[in-house]
Regions:
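Cytosolic catalytic domains that perform sulfur/thiol-centered chemistry
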Residues: 1-401
Length: 401
């Protein structure tokens, strides 16, 4: 599972993470990969029939299933069943510096039951299903994780730019809904973008421990964990506990902030809008008239339209291995030591790559909150139309059918 690859320890292991250089290929994906795409998808990961493939997993049933599947398709397969002993010996494992940001259903379930799973040292937890709209409109909240509350994205942003609201408004909305800087806040959503948008906003505000439930409600239900339909209303609190924002540095709010940063530190502006939006064929939104991108924007991979970021998701709709994204970025001239501002139309999609850089411990990454929406509102800002140098769309190596 992602969390074990990322850095969490297996229950019988003394350390977590993955063997250096290991390719991630999760058994759960087998149910989602189209038969006619299997070989090309595996090849994009570096798995081909001319190599011997060694599979390892701490779950021996999963290991049996995936190795059998590959062998049946004609791959040269070997199985390593002793990963737990490997992890407990002195052999090195690799993990992401902030792997704890992305949690599994099993981790969250342990916290709900009063346990102290790895990296959890708190005794105050709130779980939120995140989507747009108040409770009456929140379809995704109809069935939810036991004890979860609804988080309306309007609590942190407003039109017409859909940037973060003022610190005062955000503070009022957070304390009205029981959120303080020192509670552990776990966010999940049907559409990852909403939860990661809010995670970024809560980090900006000053929540010290905010996590993302990777896989959302689908992953929770697949793990046979309980849901409920009753509406839970948070108890308001008197104070957030500190001044908002505590981390203004992760937000570049408007076009002039971007231009200032470009002059000061060579900031690269990374577009996470679909290829048709990036090249100016469409604006992507019925409420955004302008087409194009801020001048100099680099395409940073995206999704099929403004509602998804498919290049960043695995077949089972969990987040893709950040190491694969880094390889894609390198081809685009996007590197770890650069100053990088991710943006999209209004800031939801951009939160996904920002979250991944945060997991990896990258230091100089931001969300440019205003995005294309704010840029196209003022004709004084330079616009690029069409792909630079007529480049064709780069391959995301993620076509599973």
């Amino acid at each position: 599972h992602d969390s074990l690859y990322n850095g969490f320890k297996d229950q019988n292991a003394t350390k977590g993470g993955h063997i250096k250089g290991a390719i991630q290929f999760t058994t759960a994906w087998l149910d989602y990969i189209a038969d006619d795409k299997f070989e090309s998808f595996a090849k994009d990961k570096g798995i081909s029939k001319d190599k011997t493939i060694v599979f390892y997993d701490s779950n021996l049933d999963d290991l049996q299933r995936i190795s059998t599947e590959f062998a049946a398709k004609g791959y040269k397969v070997k199985v390593f069943k002793d990963f737990i002993n490997y992890a407990n010996a002195d052999y090195p494992l690799e993990s992401f510096p902030n792997y704890q940001l992305s949690v599994s259903p099993q981790w969250l379930n342990a916290v709900i039951h009063g346990e102290k799973p790895e990296t959890y040292t708190n005794d105050k937890l709130m779980i939120f299903e995140v989507s747009w709209g108040d409770l009456e409109k929140a379809k995704s909240y109809t069935q939810h994780i036991v004890g979860a509350y609804h988080f309306n994205t309007d609590w942190i942003e407003n039109d017409p730019v859909w940037n973060l609201s003022t610190p005062k408004v955000i503070e009022q909305n957070l304390i009205k809904n029981g959120i303080t800087k020192d509670k552990t806040i776990v966010l999940y959503t049907e559409n990852q973008l909403a939860a990661l948008r809010v995670l970024w906003a809560l980090k900006w505000a000053g929540v010290e421990d905010v996590r993302f439930l990777n896989g959302g409600l689908t992953g929770w239900v697949d793990a046979n964990l309980p849901t409920e339909t009753q509406v839970n209303i948070p108890t308001p609190v008197a104070s957030f506990g500190t001044t908002i924002p505590q981390h203004p540095e992760i937000n570049l709010s408007m076009p002039y902030d971007v231009i200032k940063a470009q002059k000061e530190n060579g900031l690269k502006l990374i577009s996470n809008r679909s290829w048709d939006e990036y090249t100016g064929k469409i604006s992507g939104y019925d409420y955004i008239p302008g087409k194009g991108e801020p001048y100099g924007a680099i395409w940073g991979f995206a999704g099929t339209d403004s509602s998804n970021l498919a290049d960043y998701y695995d077949p089972d709709h969990t987040l893709r291995n950040p190491l694969e994204i880094v390889e894609l970025w390198k081809q685009q001239g996007i590197n770890k030591d650069d100053h990088l501002a991710f943006y999209c139309g209004t800031g939801w999609r951009a939160s996904v790559p920002w979250f991944m850089t945060n997991m990896m411990g990258w230091k100089n990454t931001y969300v440019y909150d205003g995005g294309w929406n704010a840029w196209q509102m003022d004709s004084k800002y330079p616009v690029q139309k069409g792909a630079p140098n007529n480049m064709s769309k780069p391959d995301a190596h993620n076509d599973f059918g």
